[in-house]
C-alpha cells in the first residue's frame, strides 16, 4: 500500500468534498466537522472551508478552586475497554485521558495526540503524539504507549471488550494484525488498515478508549490510578458516590487550560429524579448528569438553568433473538407493528425529541437514508401473533426503574396490550438490571449517540460483537456494513445504508421509538458544563464563578 506523505498544513482532499456536500445541504455543519476533523483537518481550517470563523471561547474567565457536586450513578469499576456505561468513564476522566475528543460542534479534537493525517484513501493514518506529556508516575508518554493501548483494544478474547469491534480494520483473528502498527519514532506511529475505515479516529473518542499505562493489568483503574490527567481519586463507593481531587504532585501537560476545580464530588442519588430535585433544593448538588421529562423545567424553577444537546441518543426496546419466541421474525415484526412511535415519544419522553424508525440510524447521521418506517397496524400485529400460535402467550417487557425509561416501556406495553396481545411489565432496580442487560429476552437499553451511523451499527448489530444485545447475526448485513465503513462520500454510502436499514426493518430487530434531546441542569455559577451529546462529564473543563 502506498503511503502518501502529507504536510500537516495540507488539507485532505476528501475534506473539500465534505465542505461541498455541506454547502449543498447533504451534510449539516456538525456532520461536516466530524468527518473533516476525523481525517486530521484542524477545526479552524474546517470552519474555513465553509467560509466561517471558528467559534470564540466564552468571555467568562474561570476561577481556580472550589468543590463541584454532581448527581450521577456510581457503578463498580473495571477495565476501561470493557466499560459499558458513560458514568464509569466520567469518574476516571480526571486521570485517564483520551487520544482525541468529540466536541459539541461535531469536531474531533486532539488530546494526547497532537495531530493526525490520513492518506487519500484512508488506509494509512499517521498519529503524532503530543510532546511533553508525562504519566503521573513520572514516565514520558510515547508512541509505544499509544501502540500498547491500540493493541489492547484489538483483543477480542477479553469478555465485554467493545473496542475490538471498532478496530476491525487493524485486527485479524481477534487481535492486532501483524504489521498494522508501525512505530516511526518516540512521538510518531502509523496505522496500516486492511481496508478504508472512515470511523477509526472517531471511534477513539468513545468512552471505552481511555488511555491506560502499560503497567495496568486490566483490573480497577481507581485502585491503581496511573494516568496523564491532573486529578486523582480519593474515594469510590458503588451506589453511593466518588470523590476526585487535584493531584499536587503531577504537572499536567495542559496546565493553565483546565483543572480549575480543587475537588469534584459525584453523588449517587438513585434513579428517581424527585430525589435529585430534593438534593438540589437542599443545596447538596450543583448539577445533574442528565435531566429528563418535566424535571428539566422543575430544576429551572429552582434556579438551575438547563442546557440542551440535539443528539442521536435513543432507547432501544430490543428483542434478543437467542430467546424464543423472539427468534421468530414474524413475532418481532408483529410487536413492532403494534407500536406507534410518535405516541411513545409523547408519553414516554414528554415529546422532547424526534420520532425514530426502528433501524437505529438517525437523520442527523450523514449517511441516513429515508426509507420509511414500520407501518403501525395493531390489527395486523394481532393476526400475525395468532398465526404463529401465540394468541395466548404472555410477553414480558423488562426495563430499569429509571423514570423516563420505565414510562417509555409502559407506553410500548400499553399499545401492544391494546392490540390484543398479552404482555406484562417488569421493572428492575438499576443494580439488578445492569448486571444482565445484554441477556434479557425483551428489554430496553439506553444507547448513546455516535457521530456516524456506521459506528452504532458496528457496535450493536454486527454478528458476534460484545454489545450485540439483540443476538442479531446476518451475513449480508455484516458485508454491507464492511462496504459502508470504507465509503467516504456521504451520497455513495447512503445507497449502501439504505440496504442496511431495510435489513433492520425486514428482520424486526428492535422497537426504537425516538431520538432524544438531552438536558443537563446546573447552578448559574457552574461554568463550561453544558450538556454533551455523548454524556461526557468533563470536569477538567468545569469551573465555579
Residue locations for each model-derived region?
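Long beta-strand-rich cores associated with HINT superfamily self-processing modules
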Residues: 520-545
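Gly/Pro-rich hinge or "lid" segments in bacterial periplasmic/extracellular proteins
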Residues: 103-107, 196-265, 274, 378-379, ...
Amino acid at each position: 500500500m502506498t503511503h502518501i506523505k502529507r504536510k500537516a498544513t495540507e488539507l485532505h482532499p476528501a475534506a473539500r468534498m465534505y465542505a461541498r456536500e455541506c454547502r449543498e445541504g447533504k451534510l449539516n455543519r456538525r456532520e461536516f466537522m466530524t468527518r473533516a476533523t476525523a481525517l486530521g483537518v484542524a477545526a479552524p481550517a474546517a470552519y474555513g472551508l465553509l467560509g466561517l470563523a471558528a467559534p470564540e471561547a466564552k468571555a467568562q474567565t474561570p476561577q481556580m478552586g472550589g468543590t463541584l457536586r454532581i448527581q450521577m450513578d456510581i457503578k463498580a469499576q473495571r477495565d476501561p475497554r470493557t466499560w459499558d456505561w458513560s458514568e464509569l468513564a466520567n469518574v476516571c476522566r480526571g486521570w485517564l485521558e483520551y487520544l482525541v475528543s468529540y466536541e459539541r460542534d461535531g469536531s474531533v479534537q486532539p488530546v494526547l495526540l497532537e495531530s493526525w493525517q490520513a492518506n487519500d484513501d484512508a488506509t494509512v493514518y499517521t498519529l503524532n503524539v503530543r510532546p511533553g506529556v508525562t504519566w503521573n508516575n513520572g514516565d514520558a508518554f510515547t508512541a509505544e504507549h499509544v501502540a500498547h493501548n491500540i493493541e489492547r483494544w484489538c483483543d477480542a478474547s477479553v469478555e465485554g471488550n467493545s473496542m475490538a469491534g471498532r478496530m476491525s480494520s487493524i485486527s485479524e483473528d481477534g487481535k492486532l494484525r501483524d504489521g498494522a502498527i508501525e512505530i516511526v519514532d518516540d512521538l510518531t506511529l502509523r496505522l496500516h488498515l486492511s481496508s478504508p475505515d472512515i470511523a477509526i479516529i472517531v471511534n477513539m473518542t468513545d468512552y471505552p478508549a481511555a488511555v491506560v499505562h502499560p503497567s495496568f493489568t486490566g483490573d480497577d483503574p481507581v485502585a491503581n490510578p496511573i494516568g496523564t490527567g491532573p486529578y486523582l481519586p480519593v474515594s469510590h463507593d458503588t451506589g453511593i458516590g466518588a470523590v476526585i481531587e487535584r493531584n499536587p504532585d503531577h504537572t499536567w501537560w495542559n496546565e493553565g487550560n483546565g483543572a480549575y476545580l480543587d475537588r469534584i464530588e459525584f453523588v449517587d442519588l438513585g434513579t428517581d429524579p424527585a430525589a435529585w430535585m430534593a438534593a438540589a433544593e437542599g443545596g447538596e448538588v450543583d448539577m445533574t448528569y442528565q435531566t429528563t421529562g418535566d424535571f428539566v423545567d422543575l430544576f429551572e424553577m429552582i434556579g438551575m438553568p438547563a442546557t440542551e444537546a440535539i443528539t442521536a441518543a435513543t432507547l432501544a426496546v430490543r428483542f434478543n433473538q437467542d430467546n424464543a419466541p423472539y427468534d421468530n421474525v414474524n413475532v418481532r415484526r408483529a410487536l413492532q407493528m403494534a407500536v406507534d412511535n410518535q405516541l411513545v415519544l409523547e408519553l414516554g419522553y414528554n415529546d422532547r425529541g424526534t420520532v425514530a424508525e426502528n433501524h437505529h440510524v438517525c437523520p442527523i447521521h450523514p449517511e441516513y437514508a429515508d426509507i420509511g418506517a414500520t407501518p403501525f397496524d395493531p390489527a395486523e400485529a394481532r393476526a400475525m401473533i395468532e398465526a404463529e400460535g401465540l394468541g395466548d402467550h404472555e410477553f414480558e417487557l423488562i426495563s430499569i426503574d429509571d423514570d423516563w425509561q420505565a414510562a417509555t416501556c409502559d407506553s410500548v406495553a400499553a399499545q401492544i396490550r391494546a392490540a390484543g396481545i398479552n404482555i406484562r411489565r417488569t421493572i428492575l432496580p438499576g443494580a439488578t438490571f445492569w448486571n444482565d442487560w445484554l441477556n434479557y429476552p425483551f428489554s430496553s437499553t439506553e444507547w448513546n449517540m455516535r457521530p456516524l451511523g456506521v459506528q452504532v451499527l458496528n457496535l450493536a448489530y454486527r454478528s458476534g460483537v460484545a454489545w450485540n444485545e439483540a443476538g442479531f447475526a446476518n451475513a449480508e448485513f455484516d458485508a454491507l456494513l464492511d462496504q459502508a465503513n470504507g465509503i467516504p462520500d456521504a451520497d455513495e454510502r447512503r445507497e449502501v445504508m439504505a440496504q442496511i436499514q431495510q435489513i433492520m426493518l425486514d428482520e424486526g430487530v428492535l422497537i426504537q421509538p425516538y431520538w432524544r434531546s438531552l438536558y443537563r441542569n446546573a447552578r448559574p455559577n457552574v461554568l463550561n458544563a453544558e450538556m454533551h451529546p455523548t454524556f461526557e462529564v468533563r470536569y477538567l473543563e468545569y469551573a465555579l464563578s
